[in-house]
């Protein structure tokens, strides 16, 4: 049995445990500070350094330099709380922390994350709390507090600092700077604001009286220790959630009298008989999160004002107490409008830095949310057909965008431009202009939670039959609108249903294209067609004739063949000469380098060849016969080849590939094949 325990115990990092439980004298702590002044950082400095410890990545988007902070990818938890597609709001948030870290004024403000429901506000707050907790365990994030020990007049052997105060607060403010300089500590780097909390101040005064003012003897009763922040242990990380007015009072934030200890100390004004366990005190040295902050009773807001502006709180029956913590809250639009319209809350508005956290407006980033939640490792025994999550994400993003004012631009095209796709007639400047004219995009629309709920419904539905596809999910999304509590207006429901129709049309175009490519994915046939085209283009540009391989006769270049290919990618008659010369110049440049031309390296030509081959082969495959009950053996074999290509090249399974082929076949049967 002992060997099994030893095996289990071997996973415990004893060295790390000892580092986290380090304790020493006040003199040893001064030496720690002298060597590493960063241990005395305030909460905002530590928060900023924590985020920056994960690095920063610059990139250009629509001619604008943006910064991505990998911290918000949640690398420590393998992306469990990763925030996608919100680099601009997160840049603003980090800039607030940076400004506060440098003491430029934002450290005296409440940070308010504002946005629609399900836009990652609470996730961001949770990440910051988790990040601080993890950072405090690392050598570079170390911070310290202290206990009183061996007190000559106390009932307890050890009395911790009730709010985990900074040990340098023990040096009186009046001569702290001179004392630190005398100890060889750089006071330009170590700037400790604030004084002792009421409990420690009381003990300090009693000891000073006891030792006749000899500070050196008083400080012998101090044991400095490493401080590890922990939300679960309520150390340096606090969370406050509003309740109904009858069941909450300000003591939840600022602490309350411990009536049991009054019997020990004889007075309720003795700070040792006070529980410094309000959320503000718990969060000292770290962060406090206010969930749905603007639902707080007005009485609580006065505590919030002092805590943010002065970094002080007022416990019942005691003097103001210094605190050092990041104050962050979050709220939705409805509650924020109450703040804006309430003249009694002007003081809070004035002390608030609002950061809008919108929904994602980039399709690829929205898709990542659902790909993470419904990955193959999580979803067992049910196949999610290709484009299912993409179409759900497309609908969600489209509901958040403003309709384009330009007549020739559709909502789906606008969505594609935002996603980085290039469209004829639109440049990066066009995208910049679109965004400028739609500044409120992302502040309304469908929440990712609604999409996730409906995907979950589909996965457990009897209709799934081992596979869910875009139509099944889009129909589920449509049906859910009738009872969606956040979509109350019929106008919005009608608009969202119209967008579902647009997304279905987009999906139809995608699968038609995939089936076309699967049919024309015969490498040998494509290579032959390409060689034939190049021979004719070469003869045309060099004003030569082409030798017919079968008759041996020299003939004029096959203009009909060349135009049938070029027409597939909208090369106008007036531009055909330029296009053909470009192709030949490219082939010539490759030849100089000793390389041969591969049509797959030219995306436009590759697409044109595939479409031409599809046009030539679709009648021989007779895909439209799929919707009939009788399919001859030869046709079935060809269809099976196409199906296997769909499975191999696009990620379908047997069921979803058959469904897509049936769907596209029904379109061809209607004579609606994409040209």
What are these regions (language model features)?
Residues 1-54:
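N-terminal accessory segments that target, anchor, or regulate ATP-driven/P-loop NTPase machines
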Residues 37-675:
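Conserved ASCE/P-loop NTPase catalytic core
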């Amino acid at each position: 049995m002992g060997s099994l325990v030893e095996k289990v115990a071997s996973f415990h990092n004893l060295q790390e445990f000892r580092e986290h439980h380090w304790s020493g004298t006040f003199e040893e702590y001064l030496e720690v500070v002298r060597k590493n002044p960063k241990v005395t950082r305030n909460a905002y400095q530590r928060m900023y350094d924590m985020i920056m410890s994960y690095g920063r990545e610059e990139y250009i988007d629509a001619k604008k330099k943006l910064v991505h902070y990998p911290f918000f990818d949640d690398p420590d938890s393998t992306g469990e709380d990763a925030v996608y597609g919100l680099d601009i709001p997160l840049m603003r948030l980090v800039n607030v922390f940076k400004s506060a870290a440098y003491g430029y004024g934002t450290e005296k403000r409440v940070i308010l994350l504002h946005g629609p429901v399900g836009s990652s506000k609470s996730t961001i707050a949770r990440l910051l709390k988790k990040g601080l907790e993890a950072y405090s365990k690392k050598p570079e994030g170390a911070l310290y507090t202290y206990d009183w020990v061996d007190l000559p007049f106390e009932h307890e052997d050890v009395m911790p600092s009730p709010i985990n105060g900074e040990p340098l607060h023990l040096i009186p403010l009046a001569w702290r700077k001179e004392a630190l300089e005398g100890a060889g500590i750089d006071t330009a780097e170590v700037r400790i604001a604030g004084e002792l909390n009421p409990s420690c101040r009381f003990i300090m005064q009693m000891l000073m009286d006891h030792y006749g003012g000899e500070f050196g003897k008083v400080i012998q009763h101090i044991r400095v220790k490493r401080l590890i922040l922990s939300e679960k242990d309520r150390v340096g990380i606090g969370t406050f959630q509003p309740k109904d007015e009858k069941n909450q009072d300000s003591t939840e934030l600022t602490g309350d009298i411990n009536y049991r200890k009054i019997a020990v100390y004889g007075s309720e004004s003795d700070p040792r008989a006070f529980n410094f366990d309000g959320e503000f005190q718990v969060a000292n040295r770290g962060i406090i999160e206010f969930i749905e902050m603007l639902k707080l009773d007005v009485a609580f807001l006065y505590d919030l004002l002092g805590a943010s502006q002065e970094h002080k709180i007022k416990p019942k029956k005691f003097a103001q107490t210094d605190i050092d913590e990041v104050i962050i809250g979050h709220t939705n639009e409805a509650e924020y409008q109450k703040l804006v319209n309430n003249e009694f809350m002007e003081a809070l508005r004035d002390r608030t830095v609002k950061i809008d956290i919108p929904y994602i407006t980039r399709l690829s980033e929205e898709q990542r949310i659902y790909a993470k939640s419904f990955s193959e490792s999580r979803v067992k025994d049910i196949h999610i057909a290709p484009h299912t999550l993409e179409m759900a994400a497309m609908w969600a993003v489209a509901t958040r965008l403003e309709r384009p004012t330009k007549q020739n631009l559709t909502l789906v095209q606008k969505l594609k431009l935002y996603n980085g796709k290039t469209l004829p007639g639109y440049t990066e400047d066009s995208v910049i202009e679109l965004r400028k004219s739609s500044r409120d995009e992302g502040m309304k629309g469908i929440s990712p939670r609604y999409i996730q709920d409906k995907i979950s419904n589909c996965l457990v539905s009897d209709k799934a039959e081992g596979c869910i596809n875009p139509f099944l999910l889009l129909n589920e999304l449509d049906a859910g609108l009738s009872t969606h509590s956040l979509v109350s207006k019929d106008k919005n429901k009608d608009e969202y249903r119209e967008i579902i129709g647009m997304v279905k049309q987009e999906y139809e175009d995608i699968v038609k294209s995939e089936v076309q490519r699967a049919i024309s994915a015969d490498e040998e046939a494509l290579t032959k067609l390409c060689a034939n085209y190049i021979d004719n283009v070469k003869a045309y540009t060099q004003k030569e004739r082409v030798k017919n391989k079968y008759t041996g006769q020299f003939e004029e270049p096959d203009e009909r063949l060349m135009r049938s290919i070029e027409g597939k990618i909208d090369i106008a008659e007036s531009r055909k000469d330029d296009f053909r010369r470009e192709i030949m110049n490219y082939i010539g440049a490759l030849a100089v380098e000793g390389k041969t031309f591969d049509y797959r390296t030219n995306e436009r030509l590759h697409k044109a060849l595939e479409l031409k081959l599809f046009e030539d082969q679709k009648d021989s495959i007779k895909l439209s016969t799929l919707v009939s009950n009788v399919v001859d053996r030869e046709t079935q074999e060809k269809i099976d080849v196409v199906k296997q290509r769909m499975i191999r090249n696009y990620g379908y399974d047997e069921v979803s590939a058959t469904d897509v082929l049936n769907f596209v076949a029904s379109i061809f049967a209607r004579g609606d094949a994409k040209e």
